[in-house]
């Protein structure tokens, strides 16, 4: 039995049955249901009271607020890259909250299962997106109620559009091994640097930031605290 190697995509021989995907060790930080676990921890730290009833990632809110406060000092964020996007919750929220919204967003993760989850999350976000409160257009009046995604499934993505959701794409690959072919105005690296450090050491971190420098105008890094290394 073979399965692709996470780092390079080449098949690796195994002489035992493959375990279900949800039982595989997340050795690259590729946790399933990571944002659900992270949300539970955040609620616990607040004494059991959620900070945001809508569940929007607090890092996204901080980033959106920072961009708004410095709008006259930074260039417009048109292209966004999320390295180690997991199931893409922050990226999808950012695409919907930035004003003006980005024209292109790319999520990259080493885990193909998580990329599949991210694509499903994109369809779900599109299906559950509600019109603006002050909108009176015919399209707004016929929006898809949130409960319908459970009753009838998700809406198909539009066949052609220059805006959300068709401006969001996901790629399953090790970004450290790919070629730098595009320039981005914002790169997200959320809860990622620890795993690069663990697998590649100090030299790997330096190489990672070197690739970032080649690709970006602005970077948002989530710095891990010391207990996360233990």
Where are these regions (language model features)?
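Conserved alpha-helix/loop element of class I SAM-dependent methyltransferases that forms part
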Residues: 29-44, 51-76, 93
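Conserved SAM-binding loop
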Residues: 118-119
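S-adenosyl-L-methionine
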Residues: 124-178
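Conserved SAM-binding loop of SAM-dependent methyltransferases across substrates and taxa
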Residues: 87-100
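A short acidic, Gly/Pro-enriched loop at the edge of an enzyme's catalytic core
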Residues: 179-187
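Residue-level detector of conserved catalytic or cofactor/ligand-binding positions
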Residues: 217-230
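A short glycine-rich, Lys/Arg-flanked "PGG" loop and its adjoining helix->strand segment in the class I
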Residues: 206-218
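Conserved class I S-adenosyl-L-methionine
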Residues: 76-86
């Amino acid at each position: 039995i073979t399965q692709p190697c996470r780092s390079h995509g080449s098949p690796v021989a195994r002489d035992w049955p493959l375990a279900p995907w949800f039982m595989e060790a997340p050795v690259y930080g590729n946790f399933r249901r990571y944002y659900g676990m992270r949300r539970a921890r955040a609620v616990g730290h607040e004494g059991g009271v959620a900070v945001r009833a809508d569940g929007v990632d607090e890092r996204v809110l901080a980033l959106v607020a920072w961009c708004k406060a410095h709008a006259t000092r930074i260039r417009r964020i048109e292209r966004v890259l999320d390295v180690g996007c997991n199931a893409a919750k922050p990226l999808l929220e950012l695409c919907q909250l930035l004003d003006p919204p980005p024209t292109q967003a790319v999520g990259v993760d080493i885990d193909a299962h998580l990329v599949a989850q991210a694509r499903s999350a994109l369809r779900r976000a599109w299906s559950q997106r509600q019109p603006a409160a002050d909108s009176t257009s015919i399209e707004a009046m016929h929006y898809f109620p949130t409960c319908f995604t459970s009753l009838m499934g998700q809406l198909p993505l539009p066949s052609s559009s220059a805006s959300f959701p068709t401006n969001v794409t996901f790629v399953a690959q090790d970004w450290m091994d790919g070629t730098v072919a595009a320039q981005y105005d914002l790169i997200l690296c959320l809860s990622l640097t620890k795993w690069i450090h663990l697998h590649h050491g100090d030299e790997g971190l330096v190489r990672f930031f070197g690739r970032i420098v080649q690709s970006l105008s602005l970077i948002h890094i989530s710095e891990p605290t010391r207990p996360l290394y233990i």
